[in-house]
Amino acid sequence: MAERDQAQESLRQWSTVAPAWEASRQRLFENVRSVSEWLVDHVRPEADQTILELTAGPGETGFLAASRLGPSGRLISSDFVPTMVEAARRGAAERGLGNVECRVIDATDIDLPDDSVDGVLSRFGLMLIPAREQAVREIRRVLRPGGRCAYATWGPPESNPWIFQLVSALLQNGWTPPGDPTAPGGLFSLATGDRNRELAAGAGFADVSVEELEGVMRFESPDDYWTLSTSVAGPVADFVGSLGDGQVDTIRATLDPSLAPFQRDGGLELPWLSIVTSVA
């Protein structure tokens, strides 16, 4: 699939699941709060600065930064999906954050002047951009001298049972992924430290730091896991939405036993591993 077609299909899919993201925003955020905190800590927002969040979704990571910027600072919360931007706008209003501007921005063509922001954040979005090299060049262009960018991607599939268990069950029951998940634009396309170092260096960043963070996604039950996971993952939601009840039952017969090793205290805890990168 050509990059333009891939981007348009991604826009359609993520527009479809934006309401589910908004409905579960706090829960999704808490499951990976440590990632958002790492990113904000490494961008080091200060009063009066301007921070840009790309691929922000409903915006929770950026809202952490906004609380450190003070009334004279500014957070630009952005996503290329308009319905996600609308969700972020509502979230900022609910939190009384008057220093947040929500905008539709394509990370590969950032509509901001050169040297115009003090920091850039992106949590779990950069790997989904087919032209990620262009996106990182754009990040470097808009960063002021001395500014920092911090972003997070998912580690390898075997280290992320929170999604691997679902994907494995779907694959065993007829799902064909829309593309190679390790190729540019795929969920696991930036799943190693080396790939992220190469990406940053290719855009001209000299100061690159890469770490791994681990945690767990918590679910009340296999039913809860199925409902939430299939409602917020764009390509998966597409496939599951086309299934009949009997087909869902067949997939669940594969999935539910695979979740048994992750049962904890009456619920489920599925591990995740994230690659976090800070560049300047």
What positions do the PLM features span?
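Conserved Class I S-adenosyl-L-methionine
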Residues: 3-10, 20, 24-25, 29-32, ...
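Class I SAM-dependent methyltransferase SAM/SAH-binding core
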Residues: 50-110, 134
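A short glycine-rich, Lys/Arg-flanked "PGG" loop and its adjoining helix->strand segment in the class I
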Residues: 133-148
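A short SAM/SAH-binding and catalytic strip from SAM-dependent methyltransferases
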Residues: 118-132, 155
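Conserved class I S-adenosyl-L-methionine
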Residues: 1-49, 60-64, 84-87, 94, 148-176, ...
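Conserved hydrophobic residues forming the short capping helix/wall of the S-adenosyl-L-methionine
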Residues: 69, 91-92, 170, 200, ...
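A short acidic, Gly/Pro-enriched loop at the edge of an enzyme's catalytic core
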Residues: 108-119
